[in-house]
């Protein structure tokens, strides 16, 4: 991770690219990250597909005109703080209809997703991951799932401050946010 030394705004970050890199803004500082690994992308996709399938099933069973919420993958940016600006980008984000029901905006909306999913990369330092979790929770995110492929565990951080570390015999749960959603970690990691 590389951080620039000048203040930048969320608006300046829109359209800012460094070929082959991922960028975030943390308290006005540009943070440049390496591209995600294939394994990282695969796990992000599996979580996203499981959530999308759950929402589609729920909509079909309940015949809702609208889904319960919106789902986004591929590092969607959210403006979590201003002056200095922080724009974080989870691997997967879910926004409930209660939190956000309008059309998807251009740029980075000033809100936090209800669920943020972070898949750890090999180069991620524990302190950096915890700082991201703290940013999500302080901005109003209800659940943060940190998926750790190296250890084959997932850590669940909740808005009420509770934390749970889940192993291969456990499952991620949508809890009250996404009732009925369950994703086995053994299935997620394709463990034997």
Model-identified regions with their sequence ranges:
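Gly/Pro/Ser/Thr-rich low-complexity, intrinsically disordered segments predominantly at protein N-termini
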Residues: 1-192
């Amino acid at each position: 991770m590389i951080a620039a030394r000048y203040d930048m705004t969320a608006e300046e970050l829109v359209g800012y690219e460094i070929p082959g890199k991922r960028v975030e803004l943390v308290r006005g500082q540009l943070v440049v990250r390496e591209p995600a690994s294939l394994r990282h992308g695969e796990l992000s996709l599996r979580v996203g597909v499981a959530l999308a399938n759950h929402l589609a099933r729920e909509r079909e069973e309940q015949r809702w005109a609208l889904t319960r919420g919106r789902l986004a993958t591929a590092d969607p940016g959210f403006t979590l703080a201003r002056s200095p600006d922080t724009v974080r980008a989870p691997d997967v984000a879910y926004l409930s209809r209660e939190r956000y029901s309008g059309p998807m905006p251009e740029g980075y909306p000033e809100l936090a997703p209800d669920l943020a999913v972070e898949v750890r990369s090999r180069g991620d330092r524990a302190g950096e991951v915890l700082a991201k979790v703290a940013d999500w929770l302080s901005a109003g995110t209800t659940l943060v799932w940190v998926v750790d492929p190296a250890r084959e565990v997932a850590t669940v951080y909740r808005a009420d401050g509770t934390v749970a570390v889940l192993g291969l015999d456990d499952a991620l749960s949508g809890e009250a946010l996404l009732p009925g959603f369950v994703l086995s970690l053994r299935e997620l990691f394709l463990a034997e």
